[in-house]
């Protein structure tokens, strides 16, 4: 759409470069590290062994072509979303008396240094917003242009319908799952424990669920979500790489991808987060330019689709 819709190939090339690099942060190393940390915290396994297993499974899918693994992951993800949703609700309801306090905390600290999870005490409003935007972008990828890569591969007679389906991902991910997680952390009070990331979420779930169920649900969810993200982002990154270099060197990208899954499971993430934030922003810039300049086409196609639904000329279930 940047090359053919706008006639600006240079924008498409910029997007392809930044997209192929951003994938190694948001979709590879951070995901692998999250999964490894969850398993280490829950089962006491080493990050080396977890990273090795994750890299082998990834290689079997993207290099070996064993699609059954990715098929199982794609089936398992909705199931795990439902379990995580129910688990988070139970945690919140078990601390219902503190829910109001938790919501108040979220709003009170939204524009203070505390919003940066204690690591940036005294941070300015600009810094807080910067980290909020960066983490929001990481959470739902809105505006990055990653989702259209997957949507473009979908078989549909109505592009507007596919766009609306893609939009639902942001709603489910951010407004539902992330909101429930935030409320669980705030209402249980574990946010002041000093833990971060998946270990903090484990504490919250363990505070509201019996036995080891909390740690089990968070661990399984983290591994499932991380692995599916690794596979999805390999596809995004590969398509960006292919646009710029052609399909001759795609196999090299896949080998490097698998290597970084293993490396990412063991590295300290501060540098990776900084790299990821920068690449995510750079990837979003050409995409947002395209969205603004092609907004007329967007509105026209959406309006035509909605009118077709109303007058019956388009079957919304087709």
Show the residue positions of the predicted features.
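Flexible loop linkers connecting adjacent transmembrane helices
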Residues: 1-6, 191-209, 235-244, 304-310
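Helix-loop-helix module between adjacent transmembrane segments
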Residues: 3-61, 220-230, 263
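Membrane-interface alpha-helices at helix entry/exit sites of multi-pass transporters
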Residues: 4-16, 51, 156-172, 247-255
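Select transmembrane alpha-helical segments in multipass membrane proteins
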Residues: 8-22, 52, 115-139, 176-184, ...
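Membrane-interface loop-to-helix entry segments
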Residues: 33-39, 45-107, 241, 273-299
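Extracellular/periplasmic helix-exit of transmembrane alpha-helices
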Residues: 87-105, 113, 117-120, 153-156, ...
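A generic transmembrane alpha-helix motif of multi-pass inner-membrane proteins
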Residues: 127, 249-303, 314-318
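Helix-loop junctions at the membrane interface of multi-pass solute transporters
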Residues: 136-141, 145-159, 166-167
């Amino acid at each position: 759409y940047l090359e053919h819709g706008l006639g600006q190939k240079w924008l498409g090339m910029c997007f392809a470069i930044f997209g192929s690099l951003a994938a190694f942060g948001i979709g590879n190393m951070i995901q692998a590290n999250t999964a490894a940390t969850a398993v280490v915290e829950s089962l006491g396994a080493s990050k080396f062994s977890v990273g090795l297993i994750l890299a082998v499974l990834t290689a079997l899918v993207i290099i070996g072509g064993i699609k059954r693994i990715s098929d199982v992951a794609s089936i398992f993800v909705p199931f795990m979303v439902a379990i995580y949703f129910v688990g988070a609700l139970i945690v919140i309801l078990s601390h219902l008396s503190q829910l109001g306090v938790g919501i108040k905390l979220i709003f009170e600290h939204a524009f203070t240094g505390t919003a940066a999870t204690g690591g940036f005490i005294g941070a300015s409003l600009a810094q807080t917003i910067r980290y909020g935007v960066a983490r929001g972008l990481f959470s739902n990828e809105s505006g990055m242009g990653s989702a259209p890569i997957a949507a473009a591969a979908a078989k549909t007679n109505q592009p507007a319908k596919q766009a609306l389906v893609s939009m639902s991902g942001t709603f489910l991910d951010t407004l539902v799952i992330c909101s429930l997680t935030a409320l669980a952390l705030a209402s249980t009070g574990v946010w002041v424990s000093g833990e971060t990331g998946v270990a903090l979420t484990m504490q919250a779930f363990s505070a509201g669920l019996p036995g080891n169920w909390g740690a089990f649900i968070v661990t399984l969810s983290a591994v499932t979500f991380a692995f599916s993200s690794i596979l999805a982002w390999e596809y995004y990154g590969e398509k960006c790489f292919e646009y710029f270099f052609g399909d001759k060197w795609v196999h090299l990208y896949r080998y490097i991808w698998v290597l970084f899954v293993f490396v990412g499971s063991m590295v300290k993430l501060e540098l990776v987060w900084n790299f990821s934030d920068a690449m995510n922003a750079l990837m979003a810039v050409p995409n947002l330019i395209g969205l603004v300049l092609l907004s007329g086409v967007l509105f026209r196609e959406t309006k035509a689709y909605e009118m077709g639904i109303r007058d019956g000329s388009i079957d919304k279930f087709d």
